[in-house]
Amino acid sequence: MTSKIFSPKISAVIESLRKLPTIGKKSSQRLALYLLDKSPETARAIANSLLDATANIKKCVYCQALTEDDVCNICSNTNRDDTKLCIIESMLDMIAIEEAGIYRGKYFVLNGRISPLDGVGPSELKLDILQRIIADRKIDEVILAISPTVEGETTAHFISQMIAKDIKISRIGFGVPFGGELEYLDQQTLLHAFNARTNI
């Protein structure tokens, strides 16, 4: 139906926008028409910044967060606690934790969860890099800040099994409902979750 109303180029923009998370048919049409009709300079600015970012952004060699440099701002910050490592699913989780101001250690970003049905295993999550980081650094606590979903539980269990027994492993707790995503929690709930973390 879309192709009968819009030209091929407009349809292509709409379909591209639909590939973004949480953007459905109506939203993609609204965004495309706004950018093309009302704000073409914004469209060009977005396109240019995306092209520049995709050409220059890479993953931090330590935590796997997106960065322009080999080492991200948090990993290179000498004021952070090197003995604590918080394992999270995405950079959105990192943003939520940082904005809550509840943690001063380092991170490791999984960029997903173990999900055999989706073809995501330990190698896709770069768990070999995680294992190397834990072995090389003097880490005394690993905090699993992984969403309590079925895939999250599987991932947390797998990671806890691969960590040396002399390292404390804890899991954030109170306030995170089963199936909940960390990035959507408010700061107070995150604070309680971190303070009420339980040892594994």
Curated annotation (Swiss-Prot):
Which molecular-function annotation in GO is an example for this chain? zinc ion binding
Instruction: Kindly give the CDD domains that the UniProt entry links to this protein.
Output: TOPRIM_recR
Q: Which residue numbers delimit the Toprim domain?
A: 83-177
Sorted keywords for this record are: DNA damage, DNA recombination, DNA repair, Metal-binding, Zinc, Zinc-finger
Cited InterPro entries: DNA_Rcmb_RecR, Rcmb_RecR, Rcmb_RecR_Znf, TOPRIM_dom, TOPRIM_RecR
Chain ranges of zinc fingers (C4-type): 60-75
Q: Which BP terms does GO give this entry?
A: DNA recombination; DNA repair
Q: Which SMART domains match?
A: TOPRIM
Which NCBIfam families has this protein been placed in?
A: recR
Give the function comment from the record: May play a role in DNA repair. It seems to be involved in an RecBC-independent recombinational process of DNA repair. It may act with RecF and RecO.
Family named by the database record: Belongs to the RecR family.
Q: What is this protein called?
A: Recombination protein RecR
Q: What is the protein's species of origin?
A: Francisella tularensis subsp. novicida (strain U112)
